[in-house]
Amino acid sequence: MEFNLVTIGFTIVNFIILMLILKHFFFDKVNKVIDDRNNEVALTIKKADAQNEEARLLKVESEKNLEDSKLQGKTIVENYKVKAEKVSEEITAEAKTEAQNILERAKRETQREKEKAEDEIKNQVVELAVLISSKALENSINEAEHRKLIEDFVSKVGI
C-alpha cells in the first residue's frame, strides 16, 4: 500500500471543490428549506398553544356561563314555585270563602223555608181550628172572637 501524495492532494482538492459546489448549489438551499420548515413548525406550535389557551379560556367561560344558567334556572323555578303556591293559596282561600258563602245562603234559605212552612202550618192550624170550633159551637161565638181564641191557643202551644 503506497501513499501517493499527489493523488491524496488532488483528492483533497476535488473534495474541497465538491464541497464548495455542493455548498453553493445545495447546502444553502437545503439549510434554507430546513430553517423554513423549523420556523413553520415553531409557528404551528405557537398557534396550537394559542388555540389551546383560547379553547381553555372558552371552556372556563362556558362552564361559568353554564353555572350561571343553572343558577338562573333554579332561581326562576323557585320564583315560579313561590308564585304557584301563592296562586294556589289564593284559589283555596277564594274557594273556602265561596263555600262559606254558599253555606250561609243555604242556611238563610233553609231558615226562610222553615219560617214560611211554620207560618203556613200556623195558618192551616188556625183555619182548621176555626173550622172545627165553628162546627162544634155552631154559631154560639162570632167568628172574630173565635179567631182570637184560636190565635191565643196557637201562641200558647207554640206552633
Curated annotation (Swiss-Prot):
<dbReference type="InterPro" id="IPR002146">
    <property type="entry name" value="ATP_synth_b/b'su_bac/chlpt"/>
</dbReference>
<dbReference type="InterPro" id="IPR005864">
    <property type="entry name" value="ATP_synth_F0_bsu_bac"/>
</dbReference>
<dbReference type="Pfam" id="PF00430">
    <property type="entry name" value="ATP-synt_B"/>
</dbReference>
<keyword id="KW-0472">Membrane</keyword>
<keyword id="KW-0375">Hydrogen ion transport</keyword>
<keyword id="KW-0812">Transmembrane</keyword>
<comment type="function">
    <text>F(1)F(0) ATP synthase produces ATP from ADP in the presence of a proton or sodium gradient. F-type ATPases consist of two structural domains, F(1) containing the extramembraneous catalytic core and F(0) containing the membrane proton channel, linked together by a central stalk and a peripheral stalk. During catalysis, ATP synthesis in the catalytic domain of F(1) is coupled via a rotary mechanism of the central stalk subunits to proton translocation.</text>
</comment>
<protein>
    <recommendedName>
        <fullName>ATP synthase subunit b</fullName>
    </recommendedName>
</protein>
<keyword id="KW-1133">Transmembrane helix</keyword>
<keyword id="KW-0138">CF(0)</keyword>
<dbReference type="InterPro" id="IPR050059">
    <property type="entry name" value="ATP_synthase_B_chain"/>
</dbReference>
<dbReference type="GO" id="GO:0005886">
    <property type="term" value="C:plasma membrane"/>
</dbReference>
<feature type="transmembrane region" description="Helical">
    <location>
        <begin position="2"/>
        <end position="22"/>
    </location>
</feature>
<dbReference type="GO" id="GO:0046933">
    <property type="term" value="F:proton-transporting ATP synthase activity, rotational mechanism"/>
</dbReference>
<dbReference type="InterPro" id="IPR028987">
    <property type="entry name" value="ATP_synth_B-like_membr_sf"/>
</dbReference>
<comment type="similarity">
    <text>Belongs to the ATPase B chain family.</text>
</comment>
<keyword id="KW-1003">Cell membrane</keyword>
<keyword id="KW-0813">Transport</keyword>
<keyword id="KW-0066">ATP synthesis</keyword>
<dbReference type="GO" id="GO:0046961">
    <property type="term" value="F:proton-transporting ATPase activity, rotational mechanism"/>
</dbReference>
<dbReference type="GO" id="GO:0045259">
    <property type="term" value="C:proton-transporting ATP synthase complex"/>
</dbReference>
<comment type="subunit">
    <text>F-type ATPases have 2 components, F(1) - the catalytic core - and F(0) - the membrane proton channel. F(1) has five subunits: alpha(3), beta(3), gamma(1), delta(1), epsilon(1). F(0) has three main subunits: a(1), b(2) and c(10-14). The alpha and beta chains form an alternating ring which encloses part of the gamma chain. F(1) is attached to F(0) by a central stalk formed by the gamma and epsilon chains, while a peripheral stalk is formed by the delta and b chains.</text>
</comment>
<keyword id="KW-0406">Ion transport</keyword>
<comment type="function">
    <text>Component of the F(0) channel, it forms part of the peripheral stalk, linking F(1) to F(0).</text>
</comment>
